[in-house]
């Protein structure tokens, strides 16, 4: 099975012509302009290909018109769906950049070797991403900055962090 990468999540219908408002899950929302198609998985986890008719950058997201989604009702059915790209359309990563799908599920340890928890979510903020680490008792928010994240081992699903005072 091919690898697929989430590039956005449908948050709502936009207008009456079948457009969907998408929350980008990429740090380059303009990349939607370069996409010819996206994949959306159905309830049985089968991929369906949708050609992109056009894209508009809007406040708090991207407006996307998918071929075959022609009414507001069609668009509303996609609310909550992830727009995905296949591996041939994935962006090349820079050094120390990672796909969210590769980070989620990582076991997180302190520099001292203590198990902290599991990375369960990546929050996109203005300045830097924030990793949500689920411990036995609670969730901890860790800024995704080099002063905190000391090592990321994608192959072994392990992250090592230096906890700043107050975390």
Swiss-Prot record:
It holds the Pfam family PRC_RimM. InterPro entries: PRC_barrel-like_sf, PRC_RimM, RimM, RimM_N, RimM_N_sf, Transl_B-barrel_sf. Keywords: Chaperone, Cytoplasm, Ribosome biogenesis, rRNA processing. GO terms for molecular function: ribosome binding. The keyword rRNA processing applies. It comes from the Bacteria. Coiled coil: none annotated. GO terms for biological process: ribosomal small subunit biogenesis; rRNA processing. The PRC barrel domain binds ribosomal protein uS19. Belongs to the RimM family. An accessory protein needed during the final step in the assembly of 30S ribosomal subunit, possibly for assembly of the head region. Essential for efficient processing of 16S rRNA. May be needed both before and after RbfA during the maturation of 16S rRNA. It has affinity for free ribosomal 30S subunits but not for 70S ribosomes. Binds ribosomal protein uS19. This is Ribosome maturation factor RimM. It comes from Thermoanaerobacter pseudethanolicus (strain ATCC 33223 / 39E).
